[in-house]
Amino acid sequence: MAKRPVATSSDDELPFEIEEPVAADERAFFGGQPQKPAAANAKAALPASLAAQEHYHGHRERLRDRFREQGDTALADYEILELLLFRLIPRRDTKPIAKALIERFGSLAGVFGAPAALLTEVKGVGEAVALDLKLISTVAHRTLKSELRSKQVLSSWSSVIQYCHAAMAHETREQFRILFLDKRNVLIADEVQGRGTVDHTPVYPREVVKRALELSATAMILVHNHPSGDPTPSRADIDMTKVIIEAAKALDITVHDHVIIGKDGHVSLKGLKLI
C-alpha cells in the first residue's frame, strides 16, 4: 500500500511511499555353505534403503513416461515440480520435497517467486537447489521480457501484465518498476526504481522523469506490487501517480498507466478512470 512522504532525497525532494553388513547366516557354523535365497525372494532380501531407492527410481520413470506421453496436463503441480527436482536432487525421493514446497508457498508460481532464503527453510532444499530454482525463474522472466521487446507494448497489453505478474506478484517487499517506451511504444528499458518494505516504497517523481530523459523515452508505464496480495490502490498511490504525470507532461513525456500487481490479479489506474 502507499503512504505520504516520509523522507527526502539528496535533492530535498519529498518521496512518495507506495504502499520461503547383513548378519551372517548361522547355518555356516554347522558346516556347509549358507543357502542362497531363492530368486523370487531376492527383492525382499534387499536392505530397506535399497528397496526404497528401487521404488522411487521406478516412480521417477513412471512419472517421466506420463509426461512424455500425455504432456503436462496429466500431472499435478507438485508432480511437475517433482520432475524438475529429479535433476536437482538425483539420489533422494523428491515427492515429499515437492509437496512441502507447494504447501509452503501455495503454488508453482509461489515456489519460483519465493526468495532463496525462504526456499532453504523447506526440509531437503539446500542453497544449491534454491539457487537452481531461482535460475529457472529468471529464465522464465527473461523469456517473457524478450517477447515484449519486439512488440508495441500497448497492443500487447496481456503480455505486459503477464510479465509484470511473473516478475512482481510474489515479491515479499514492495518494488516500484518503470517500463520506458520510445515514440512507437516499443520497450526501451525495464527498471526497478525502488525497493521498500512489505507495505511501502519511496518514489521520487523528479528522479522518474530524469531517468526517462536519460533514456530518451517518450512514454512510461508505472508498475508496483502489493505483497499483501490486494492490488487496490491507496489514495497516496493515486496522488503520487498524478504528480509524476504532471512532471512528465511538462517535458512531453506520456504516462500511459500505473498498474498495481497482486498475487491473484492486477489493477489499472487508467482502467479505473483514476488518472
Swiss-Prot record:
Pinpoint motif JAMM motif by residue range: 224-237
Alphabetically list the UniProt keywords: Hydrolase, Metal-binding, Metalloprotease, Protease, Zinc
Pfam families assigned to the protein according to its UniProt record, in alphabetical order: RadC, UPF0758_N
GO terms of biological process kind? proteolysis
**Binding positions (Zn(2+)):** H224, H226, D237
Going by the entry's taxonomy, the superkingdom of the source organism is recorded as: Bacteria
Please name the source species: Rhizobium leguminosarum bv. trifolii (strain WSM2304)
| Boundaries of every MPN domain copy | 153-275
Into which family does the record put it? Answer: Belongs to the UPF0758 family.
Q: Which residues cross the membrane?
A: none
Q: Which InterPro entries match?
A: MPN (IPR037518), RadC_JAB (IPR025657), RuvA_2-like (IPR010994), UPF0758 (IPR001405), UPF0758_CS (IPR020891), UPF0758_N (IPR046778)
Q: Spell out the protein name for this chain.
A: UPF0758 protein Rleg2_1511
